[in-house]
Design a protein with these regions (language model features):
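Generic structural signal for small/hydrophobic residues in well-ordered secondary structure
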Residues: 5-6, 49, 82, 107
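Short, well-structured N-terminal submotif of metal-dependent ribonuclease cores
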Residues: 1-41, 51-64, 134-143
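A generic structural signal for short hydrophobic patches within well-formed alpha-helices
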Residues: 9, 46-49, 121-122
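Hydrophobic helix-cap positions at the C-terminus of alpha-helices
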Residues: 31-35, 85, 89, 124
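Structured helix-beta-strand junction loops
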Residues: 35-36, 65-69, 92, 110, ...
Length: 143
């Protein structure tokens, strides 16, 4: 499974002005959906995405789009794992946020790769065991 982070969804669904090229992440996301790849969205990411919209129409548009993705909700064990991630990162001097630790925990517990543009997750990967979805570089998960 591939879990989507807010950074990817925000850029992919951002309205573009005429002639503006499609962001690479939007094209990759479209290819993942077309290939019927298992793609999910953490519940907290859905909340973050929808909390940033300005109009009820945009809220409804994004809600409709997001219904096409599996919703990944946190369980008790995910919260415990998130706390362990925060502690492991703190011991290494890596700053984290509670939300980012929960997103990482959800990816780890579902054996999913996290598709993100947020560099904080790259710093968290080694101490947490988080797998990041790669969009270039020749690996098997590349798109």
């Amino acid at each position: 499974m591939i879990l989507l982070d807010t950074s990817v969804l925000s850029l992919a669904f951002r309205r573009r002005r005429g002639g503006e090229p499609e962001p690479q992440v939007a094209a990759i996301l479209r290819r993942l959906v077309a290939a019927d790849a298992p793609v999910g969205v953490p519940g907290i990411v859905l909340q973050e995405l929808l909390s940033g919209v300005r109009t009820p129409q945009e809220f409804d548009r994004l809600t409709g789009i997001m219904e096409g993705f599996a919703l990944v909700l946190a369980r008790r064990e995910d919260h415990l794992t998130a706390a362990r991630i925060a502690n492991a990162c703190a011991r290494k001097g890596i700053p984290t946020s509670t939300v980012d630790c929960l997103i990482a925990a959800l990816a780890i517990s579902r054996q999913a790769a996290l598709f993100t543009l947020d560099a904080d997750f790259a710093r968290m990967a080694a101490p947490s065991g988080l797998t990041l979805f790669k969009i270039s570089g020749g690996g098997a998960a590349d798109w």
